[in-house]
Amino acid sequence: METKRLTQRSMVFVLAGGRGSRLKELTDRRVKPAVPFGGKARIIDFALSNALNSGIRKMAIATQYKAHSLIRHLQRGWTFFRAERNEFLDILPASQRTGTEAWYAGTADAVTQNIDIVDSYDVDYVIILAGDHIYKMDYEVMLREHVETGADVTVGCLTVPRMEATAFGVMATDETGKITSFLEKPADPPAMPDDPNSALASMGIYVFKWSFLRELLVADALDTNSSHDFGHDLIPEIVENGKAMAHRYDRSCVRADGAPVYWKDVGTVDAFWEAHIDLTNFTPDLDLWDKNWPIWTYSESVPPAKFIHDERDRRGMAISSMVAGGCIISGTEVRNSCLFTGVHTNSYAVLDHAVVLPNVVVNRHARLRKVVVDSDVVVPEGLVVGEDPTEDAKWFRVSERGVTLITQDMLDKRAQAQ
């Protein structure tokens, strides 16, 4: 089968229902895949853009937890598919479609409850994706590899520090790339044979032939001992009784020559902040400026960013920073920061190593250092954060690495107490 034909007969099924509780208050109002990232996009845009850039125009998104923000984003920004060419992006909320009163019970169950819908798509291959990671990957390479090896499942994988592997599925392979063992989120991850400090971790990306996966899902649904999860149940079953192959991410990672392999789980406040600060570097690890592999998203119709005032201590300026459209930097010093769409800052304020989500207002004389500010926050005049950790911890959430998360609810409680 030709490669072009492979992508035309394939779809992606994106699992986008998880809260992402490690992001703390950032996911109080929205599901993790809907969290803004990179100045104007959402986290889910990376998985969807990878599919689109790989030539796959059949997409289904399973949603569950606080999905309104995500659904609104998809409806506004991902409506360019042509139904007459059998292109689509379908949103599949948990809706008890199997006749039971249960919502999605696990990652595999999210597909099981939509078996009839996937049947109607008439595809040969299904790529299961997590909707909450930041990376650029050509799924076509992995899909072709899956077909050529005759695997029952192909699992995307990459090398991670062993002590961080407790959050992932961890596998071992033989010299052919066949997976010989698979442990989901082990307390003591096994090391790679040639590197005691590293482990081979699953990316949560799986390629199946639909007919094979369908049979597996039907059997799993009848298993009362199953948690109905790909990592805990289905993948170990195939490793033991079938042919599971590992696909090394470095073979399909989209990057410039000599650039590092980039894949981030921005699932903590620290990781979220660090990924954004990296974007302000001279040569960031993640290239958002690659016209050959664009990150598609919904773009508001807003004017360009504007910088106002040029006086001592009242100069609208941004150094080593990303400033999105619709921002007004009025007499504010911005350094090593990422400002999302529609941020307005006022005179004598300072933003240093700050990640400021959309539609935030920063009032005069505020000083914010090493912070993440949630969307729609109004920062009061004279607020100082990032200089006194003890004081910050009284009102805001301070992470293990000293990043302070600020939300409107936190500011309201602070104002009421003073």
Swiss-Prot record:
Pathway: Glycan biosynthesis; glycogen biosynthesis. Keywords: ATP-binding, Carbohydrate metabolism, Glycogen biosynthesis, Glycogen metabolism, Nucleotide-binding, Nucleotidyltransferase, Transferase. Its EC number is 2.7.7.27. PROSITE patterns: ADP_GLC_PYROPHOSPH_2, ADP_GLC_PYROPHOSPH_3. It is an enzyme of class 2 (transferase). InterPro entries: ADP-Glc_PPase, ADP_Glu_pyroP_CS, GlgC_bac, GlmU/GlgC-like_hexapep, NTP_transferase_dom, Nucleotide-diphossugar_trans, Trimer_LpxA-like_sf. GO terms for biological process: glycogen biosynthetic process. Alpha-D-glucose 1-phosphate binds at Y104, G169, E184, K185, S202. Pfam families: Hexapep_GlmU, NTP_transferase. It catalyses: alpha-D-glucose 1-phosphate + ATP + H(+) = ADP-alpha-D-glucose + diphosphate. The keyword Transferase applies. The keyword Zinc-finger does not apply. One of its GO terms (molecular function) is glucose-1-phosphate adenylyltransferase activity. HAMAP family: GlgC. Involved in the biosynthesis of ADP-glucose, a building block required for the elongation reactions to produce glycogen. Catalyzes the reaction between ATP and alpha-D-glucose 1-phosphate (G1P) to produce pyrophosphate and ADP-Glc. Belongs to the bacterial/plant glucose-1-phosphate adenylyltransferase family. Homotetramer. PANTHER family: GLUCOSE-1-PHOSPHATE ADENYLYLTRANSFERASE, GLUCOSE-1-PHOSPHATE ADENYLYLTRANSFERASE-RELATED. This is Glucose-1-phosphate adenylyltransferase. It comes from Jannaschia sp. (strain CCS1).
